[in-house]
Amino acid sequence: MAASAFAGAVRAASGILRPLNILASSTYRNCVKNASLISALSTGRFSHIQTPVVSSTPRLTTSERNLTCGHTSVILNRMAPVLPSVLKLPVRSLTYFSARKGKRKTVKAVIDRFLRLHCGLWVRRKAGYKKKLWKKTPARKKRLREFVFCNKTQSKLLDKMTTSFWKRRNWYVDDPYQKYHDRTNLKV
């Protein structure tokens, strides 16, 4: 009764516990077989058969310790590849201290995907502006091509992921963002 309830609970669990379902059911089946084998070997049915003291043929020795249900090494070996992906936390690939000079490094993906204005705002494209365009309407494609500002939290995070080199003012020839670098009519 308890074993079926356990198997039902494991079967009901989703996601991470799916590999455990196969493991638990096979372990349970092995335990039942091993328990019946142990009981068959431990009974006195075969007491009248005598084995020679020294045998010329190697025989299979079966001990209760080998037949028990504790397959801890098998469980650990099966679950070892799954555990790092479960326990892995989301991280920013930010180098706080470089190996050679001990300085912070810029995350290159930030430089490729975002543009920092001198006033501290970050500009980005909308997500999915290149994806599955065949099923998007022209109006939606136009909206996705627009540039938008990042919010305060995103801007602070992006500032932490870049060095001071990327925060300096640049004077590019024919810069289309020249009029947006400085905020005007801003009441502080």
From Swiss-Prot:
Subcellular location: Mitochondrion
InterPro entries: Ribosomal_bL35-like, Ribosomal_bL35_sf, Ribosomal_bL35m
Keyword Protein biosynthesis among record annotations: no
Keyword list, A-Z: Mitochondrion, Ribonucleoprotein, Ribosomal protein, Transit peptide
Gene3D superfamilies (UniProt xref): 4.10.410.60
Cellular component GO terms held in the UniProt record: mitochondrial inner membrane; mitochondrial large ribosomal subunit; mitochondrial ribosome; mitochondrion
Domain of life: Eukaryota
Chief localisation class: mitochondrion
GO biological process, one term: mitochondrial translation
Heme is among the record's keywords: no
GO molecular function: structural constituent of ribosome
Similarity comment text for this entry: Belongs to the bacterial ribosomal protein bL35 family.
Quaternary context: Component of the mitochondrial large ribosomal subunit (mt-LSU). Mature mammalian 55S mitochondrial ribosomes consist of a small (28S) and a large (39S) subunit. The 28S small subunit contains a 12S ribosomal RNA (12S mt-rRNA) and 30 different proteins. The 39S large subunit contains a 16S rRNA (16S mt-rRNA), a copy of mitochondrial valine transfer RNA (mt-tRNA(Val)), which plays an integral structural role, and 52 different proteins.
Protein name in UniProt: Large ribosomal subunit protein bL35m
Gene (name only): MRPL35
